[in-house]
Amino acid sequence: MKLNDIKRLYKIVRVFLSYGIDEILPHNKYTRSIRCWRMLFFWLKNKHKNKAFGLCLRLALQELGPVWIKLGQMLSTRRDLFPAEIADELALLQDNVEAFSGKIARQQIEQALGSSLENWFTDFDENALASASIAQVHTAKLKLGEEQEKEVVIKVLRPNIQPQIEADLSWMYKLAGLLPKLFREGYRLRAVEVIQEYEKTLRDELDLRVEMANAIKLRENFLDSPMLYIPKMYEAFCHKNVIVMERIYGIPVSDVETLQRNGTDMKLLAERGVQVFFTQVFRDSFFHADMHPGNIFVNPHYPENPQYIGIDCGIVGKLNESDKRYLAESFVAFFNRDYRRVAQMHVDAGWTPQDTNIDDFEQAFREVCEPIFAKPLSEISFAQVLLNLFNVAREFNMQVQPQLVLLQKTLLYIEGLGRQLYPQLDLWDTAKPFLQNWLNEQIGMKVTFKKLKAKLPYLQEHLPDFPETLMDALKQQKFISQQLVEINKKLAKQQRWQKKMFVLIVGIVIFSVTLWQFAALPLAISAGLFLVGFLVWLIGFLLP
């Protein structure tokens, strides 16, 4: 262990102890070592005894720095793991950190481009436009030739961030591995899986080319759409630690007052947020999974026909056809209060084990979800529905589905945003036609022919081999059948032998007990028992 690792460990321990994070753990033999840490560092007192645990956890993560802040932000969306009061506190974590020097940013850009910044850009502002834990952005103008320029923003990765991330991830894995041993509920949290999911997201953010590729795909999916605009990426200037994109001007989606002053159709804007989300999920199978208010703006030029502008495409979610179908059918079944169908969908999708008891599963869904319908449909939260479904499924050993976790997080953002813009938004009324139409399209002849067409190249390649493959399969089947016959013969022989041995042993036991008690028993009874024992033994001996 290096000196820097020891220093980092001490800081983590110091922060956790000073905020009393250890005090939530139960007193048992597994937590004895943690209590020893508390005694060893006797000078690190809990300075926040009167504060709620959620607040202390948020403040501790805030003090530990960017990597822990981002972990807390991710955990705030995992309401299937944490009580609402803790998740709400973690949602308040801010990713704003002090910007690094503009001169260092310039050096990073020039190193990536392989030439002086002035060869490609003018008006480069060394003061960062915005700064976050992983990267910061600067404004400039890109030279397009013939005295033309285009306003752009340049996103630059923080220098030397990799070693800190590696060190923090290492300690996160160690802590996650300890949790199941420290308290009973630790197994339910599946902490190691959570850190694995977080690591994947974090590593994607460390390669800005991933964000570039995501933005290009989203832009293509919504090209010329009145609902969503994604800024253009300038691929020739994009590298692992630097990307260049079109600069946009818009009204922050959270600035409701400015949107209203601009004459924005708030009802249509809220409905379009829902439509954009479901279009990404069910049409494209590819959705922006970081749609919090800081990443969404509204085009100010079309208030009567409002258009969203999305930035920061570093985190995206992907769903396969199976996930989409099961998810859509589960939603429709839920709102039809068909809980057996919901339960069956989870099993058929492979989200829960195949041996799950459907009757128990259905009843669990009914008990948790039925109270939701005490509210009008317009007030039911889609995100809460999804959360309830996941919570029940986890009790039946549902494995963590990262794509569904991202979906639930994004839906939470979209729903909250929609109701902030237009409190009367009926999410189900907006989404149901979309889901129903999509499901109807999946069972039509057009889709069937489309799927067959997609399989044609595979069929053309493998059809000539089909007779040979079929013969091999038949031979294999014959061989397997012969093997099964042999196995059955051996099993039958073994069962006969076991039966024979049992009868022989019973006969010997009767004979032995009679011999042992011969003096204590009347002669007639002893003779009778000898005869019975001999006959039982003889039957066993004569058995095949």
UniProtKB/Swiss-Prot annotation:
Coiled coil: none annotated. The active site is at D290. InterPro entries: ABC1_dom (IPR004147), Kinase-like_dom_sf (IPR011009), UbiB (IPR010232), UbiB_bact (IPR045308), UbiB_kinase (IPR050154). Its EC number is 2.7.-.-. It is a multi-pass membrane protein. Belongs to the ABC1 family. UbiB subfamily. Is probably a protein kinase regulator of UbiI activity which is involved in aerobic coenzyme Q (ubiquinone) biosynthesis. This is Probable protein kinase UbiB.
